[in-house]
Design a protein with these regions (language model features):
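Alpha-helical scaffold/interaction cores of sigma-54-like transcription cofactors
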Residues: 1-185
Length: 185
């Protein structure tokens, strides 16, 4: 992953001049460069797109990563609470809010479009440590998600350290049913 790619990713979401955000991406790149997180995040992003996003709950070291969020691996944005305009990319941070999802509606002061309220103020330092990404899926989607993951990694000619693939773990991604749900494994 190059610095140009990270800059382009920043500008696509937040516009030109969002250098503190770009700086955070560079720091996350440095923290994740030598581990297995990036391939897992790409896989998780593709899985969320394939299964409609909201039916796949991503847990673990993904939710505090801006890079994972911008790649689409998690809906959780770890930046401090803010508004961003999807139309003109105008950005406003709100230092008084506890969480971006609680911000009131706001029209963009630049173009008048409705702004997106986002941000949960999560630090990237907790990316250091064990690289675990856990996925929770509804019971009726468990088998299709397992099959999709096997196909995804098989197409990339990847091997795992456990032969054959487990029913609950594929290439470091742990699959679980929501708490209290019985069956499937």
């Amino acid at each position: 992953m190059t610095k140009d790619f990270l800059l382009r990713l920043t500008e696509e979401h937040y516009g030109a001049g969002a250098f503190p955000i770009y700086g955070r991406l560079l720091e996350e790149q440095r923290l994740t460069r030598s581990g297995p997180l990036l391939p897992m995040w790409y896989c998780t992003a593709a899985l969320r797109r394939a299964f409609g996003g909201e039916n796949v709950l991503v847990l673990g070291c993904t939710n505090n990563s801006l890079l994972a969020h911008l790649l689409g691996a998690t809906p959780v944005n770890p930046l401090p609470p803010h508004y961003h305009c999807p139309n003109c990319r105008h950005l406003i941070f709100d230092a008084h809010a506890d969480d971006g999802w609680d911000l009131p509606n706001l029209a963009c002061p630049e173009c008048g479009a409705p702004m997106v309220a986002d941000g949960h103020d999560l630090r990237s330092r907790s990316l250091i440590g064990e690289s675990v990404v856990s996925l929770q899926v509804p019971q009726e989607q468990f088998a299709p998600v397992c099959a999709w993951l096997r196909d995804y990694w098989a197409q990339r000619d990847c091997q795992t350290d456990t032969e054959p693939y487990s029913d609950t773990e594929v290439m470091g991604l742990r699959l679980t049913l929501p708490e209290g749900v019985q069956g499937m494994f």
